[in-house]
């Protein structure tokens, strides 16, 4: 499937609504009539206020959650359950604490039938690519936060996903480590050209990384606007923030996003007033 520009559509959400039901039976609508497209090889960042359904959007694309209404397609095929073409890097590490770095990274290939020795060799290749050489036999609790994120990236990318979903993967890191990880991510993405959907609360991070930024409304979430990020590549995420065009993009997108942040904030104050 292609879009009007002739590029292959990697992801398509068409009229998607997602409702959840609480234990008491109350219905909560996280997303309503959301339309979104990501073309092959695109780096798309998604921003919006807390609780607007950004993470839910990733869960629908991955197949971890079904839609209530509408359709999600990956390369033209409706999503019906988890697909191996999609990799997912969560906000919190999804590594196995009882396994060392090599065994954590090799899990994916082994699951898909690659022999143990070959899986370990492939794991070592990816360990080197993400900058963890020398730590092959360390356990997750022996690694720094940045190293654990590198481990999570290797664990996901070793499976060569055509689509990479990332849910605030660097939010818990310090500023310096975060900038290093963002640059490493861009280098890995440039080599793989996977289609990326990157959820973040940090608008600067979104602009520094992405080809396009999607703004989601206060919940129930739907797409409010999209912005093309016409900054040159390759990028250094720390340096590009000082470019005049970066500042201009930030002002344009923030003027749009802040209205939704204020709506979300006022709603949260009302909930506190009702339930002190």
Residue ranges and their predicted role:
Residues 47-49:
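The feature captures the beta-strand-to-loop junction immediately N-terminal to the Walker
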Residues 62:
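Helix-to-loop junction immediately C-terminal to a conserved catalytic motif
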Residues 70-82:
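Conserved ABC transporter NBD signature motif
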Residues 99-107:
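Short coil-to-helix segment of the ABC ATPase nucleotide-binding domain corresponding to the Q-loop/switch region
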Residues 110, 117-135, 187:
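Conserved ABC ATPase "signature" region
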Residues 138-141, 159:
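Conserved signature/switch motifs of ABC ATPase nucleotide-binding domains
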Residues 153:
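Hydrophobic anchor residue at the start of the ABC signature
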Residues 164-167:
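Catalytic Walker B motif of ABC-type/P-loop ATPase nucleotide-binding domains
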């Amino acid at each position: 499937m292609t879009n009007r520009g002739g590029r292959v559509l990697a992801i398509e959400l068409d009229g998607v609504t997602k409702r959840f039901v609480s234990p008491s039976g109350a219905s909560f609508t996280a997303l309503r009539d959301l339309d979104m497209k990501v073309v092959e090889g695109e780096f798309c960042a998604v921003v919006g206020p807390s609780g607007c359904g950004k993470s839910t959007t990733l869960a629908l694309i991955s197949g971890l959650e079904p839609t209530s209404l509408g359709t999600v397609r990956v390369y033209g095929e409706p999503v019906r359950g988890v697909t191996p073409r999609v990799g997912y890097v969560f906000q919190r590490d999804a590594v196995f604490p009882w396994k060392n770095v090599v065994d954590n990274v090799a899990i994916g290939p082994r699951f898909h039938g690659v022999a143990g020795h070959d899986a370990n060799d492939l794991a070592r290749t990816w360990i080197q690519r993400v900058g963890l050489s020398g730590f092959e036999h360390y356990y997750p609790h022996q690694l720094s936060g940045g190293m654990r994120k590198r481990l999570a990236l290797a664990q996901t990318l070793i499976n060569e996903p055509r689509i990479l979903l990332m849910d605030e993967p660097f939010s818990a890191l310090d500023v310096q480590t975060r900038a290093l990880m963002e640059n490493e991510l861009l280098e890995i993405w440039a080599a793989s050209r996977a289609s990326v959907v990157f959820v973040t609360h940090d608008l600067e991070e979104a602009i520094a990384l992405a080809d396009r930024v999607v703004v989601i409304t206060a919940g129930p979430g739907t797409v409010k606007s999209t912005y093309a990020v016409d900054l040159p590549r390759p990028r250094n995420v720390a340096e590009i923030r000082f470019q005049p065009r970066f500042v201009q993009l930030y002002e344009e997108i923030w003027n749009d996003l802040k209205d939704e942040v204020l709506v979300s904030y006022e709603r949260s104050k009302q909930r506190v007033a009702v339930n002190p």
